[in-house]
Amino acid sequence: MGAAVLLLAALAGCSSSSSDEAGDGDGPDGQATASAPAPSAPASGKRWQPKPGTPWQWQLDGKADTSVDVPVYDIDGFENSAATVAELHARGRKVICYFNAGAWEDFRPDKNAFPKGVLGAKNKGWEGEKWVDIRRLDVLKPIMASRIDMCRKKGFDAVEPDLTEGFRNSTGFKLTADDQLAFNRMLAKLAHDRGLSVALKNDLDQIPQLVGDFDFAVNEQCAQYGECERLTPFIKAGKAVFHVEYDLKPEEFCSQTTRLGLSSMQKRLGLDAWRKPC
């Protein structure tokens, strides 16, 4: 990983569960709830479109804790099974499939599908990761297609491809903004061709060019870096912005992000089940 509301009460992205309000946020919020009817199947060719202000949970560390009472889960596509996705659907949740698109990871089951020639510099701070040469669409497209196929077969509603702003990093390759646009649009098309919605992860510089290609955004730390205003094209287009802060406390960012329409919460950097929504 890279490794950030419309004021409608029914969709308050900054609403917290009883356990969040009562405690200091040290444990996963919410208790197991009675199963709700599964979401109705979308009309033919219609993708799920999350709306601004929709509450969410983001857990990439291990198997998902399915007890958190929110309508959207974003979980690791490799670490979670079709049964987990089905359980969340039975509770009325929509489920996003996380995978790393911009970097190779030495712990993934498809690691040998990446030729050595597309592996670049280490992704500093993330053990076992190396940037990939996003210019090599001929090599990466079938690998990404296979990952998105995995998400579709497991029943996910959407995908979150991570590290989609490599051109702003020291990847070991001379990547350009146009290289990044082509790669990101390839990811969006692969998802849409399979009936899945797709998130634009961070990549604030290219939001004006890509807001029409992506169905929602996932952002880390826009409040910490004073960048949340740059996400408003998604909100104006009626598309959710799922946002987290790691170092700031909710009282330091919620008033701003609620006003802008973001679905915000504080998470630990390890992205376990713990959360403190606005």
Q: What positions do the PLM features span?
A:
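N-terminal low-complexity, Pro/Thr-rich disordered segments
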Residues: 2, 8-47
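Extended, hydrophobic alpha-helical segments
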Residues: 14, 234-235
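N-terminal carbohydrate-binding/catalytic regions of secreted carbohydrate-active enzymes
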Residues: 42-129, 134-135
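C-terminal active-site rim and adjoining tail of enzyme catalytic domains
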Residues: 52-61, 218-227, 235, 240-278
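Hydrophobic faces of well-ordered beta-strands that scaffold small-molecule active sites
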Residues: 56, 71-75, 95-99, 159-161, ...
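Active-site-adjacent beta->alpha loops and helix N-cap segments on the catalytic face
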Residues: 79-90, 178-179, 226-234
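Chitinase-like catalytic core of GlcNAc-active glycosidases
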Residues: 99-160, 164-229
